[in-house]
């Protein structure tokens, strides 16, 4: 069954400064959308607001998941509803192993009595770790503690594959990765691709899109989505930069799809 994530006229402020000034965007399962734009245009603010970061105040608009306004839900309820955020800077949690964290997260999404048993969990974890070329000992390390930048990003994708959300928001998942790590991360995202999964990928660089072909590319500027198109739009940005995007501010569509 297909699902829809719809962002409608979203305005977001932090410390009384408005960052998002009316974002409109619709993503369906079966689609991967890329969001690009210069620094300071609100890309990461968008991901944080969708997931309910307490530092960001939504002053106007809605974020609808299958018609339900998730802005009225707590962070854990948003995750249970089917949202996942791969963070740019994942937190370290001392005393909680990677495996325990993921099993708890899986069971938190499930109804009582439907929890994943230990053998099912280990079988799936081993399979996904092998697919992502992750050392098995990482499962017993404390979450992100002492992980390299590349290990943290691979671990975010491992969590994505274990949790199988409806929608993932991938906030600069490619930042700081060498080419080998980028290929592994991209392989994991492409493996998730299908009719039951949708994603918003926030990135600065065309290089990620060389490995993950998006269905749509959106350009953010001045706190809004000002241009939408196909993969060719990202290539134009790489060749010409963002200066030409300023002209699009006069022609912003109210609901790019």
What annotation goes with each model-predicted range?
Residues 36-38:
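The feature captures the beta-strand-to-loop junction immediately N-terminal to the Walker
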Residues 251-257:
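Conserved small/polar residues in nucleotide/adenosyl-binding loops
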Residues 91-166:
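ABC-family P-loop ATPase nucleotide-binding domains
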Residues 172-173, 180:
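Walker B catalytic motif
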Residues 5-7, 20:
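Conserved structural motif at the start of ABC-family nucleotide-binding domains
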Residues 220, 224-247:
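Conserved beta-strand-loop-alpha-helix hinge in the C-terminal portion
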Residues 62-78, 144:
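ABC ATPase NBD Q-loop/coupling interface
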């Amino acid at each position: 069954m297909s699902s829809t994530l719809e962002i409608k006229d979203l305005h977001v402020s932090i410390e009384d400064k408005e960052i998002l000034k009316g974002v409109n965007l619709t993503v369906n399962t079966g689609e991967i959308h890329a969001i690009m734009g210069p620094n300071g245009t609100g890309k990461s603010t968008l991901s944080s607001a969708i997931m309910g970061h307490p530092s960001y105040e939504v002053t106007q608009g809605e974020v609808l998941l299958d018609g339900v306004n998730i802005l009225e839900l707590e962070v854990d309820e948003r995750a249970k509803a089917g949202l996942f955020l791969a963070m740019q800077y994942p937190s370290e949690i001392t005393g909680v192993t990677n495996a325990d964290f993921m099993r708890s997260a899986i069971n938190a999404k499930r109804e009582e009595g439907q929890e994943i048993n230990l053998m099912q969990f280990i079988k799936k974890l081993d399979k996904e770790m092998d697919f992502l070329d992750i050392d098995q000992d990482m499962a017993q390390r404390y979450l992100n503690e002492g992980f390299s930048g590349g290990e943290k990003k691979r671990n975010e994708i491992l969590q994505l594959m274990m949790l199988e959300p409806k929608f993932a928001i991938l906030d600069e998942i490619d930042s700081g990765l060498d080419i080998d790590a980028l290929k592994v991360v991209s392989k994991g995202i492409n493996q998730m691709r299908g009719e039951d999964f949708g994603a918003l990928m926030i990135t600065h660089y065309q290089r990620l899109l060389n490995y993950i072909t998006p269905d749509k590319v959106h350009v953010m500027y001045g706190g809004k989505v000002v241009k939408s198109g196909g993969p060719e739009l990202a290539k134009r940005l790489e060749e010409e930069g963002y200066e030409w995007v300023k002209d699009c501010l006069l022609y912003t569509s109210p609901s790019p799809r």
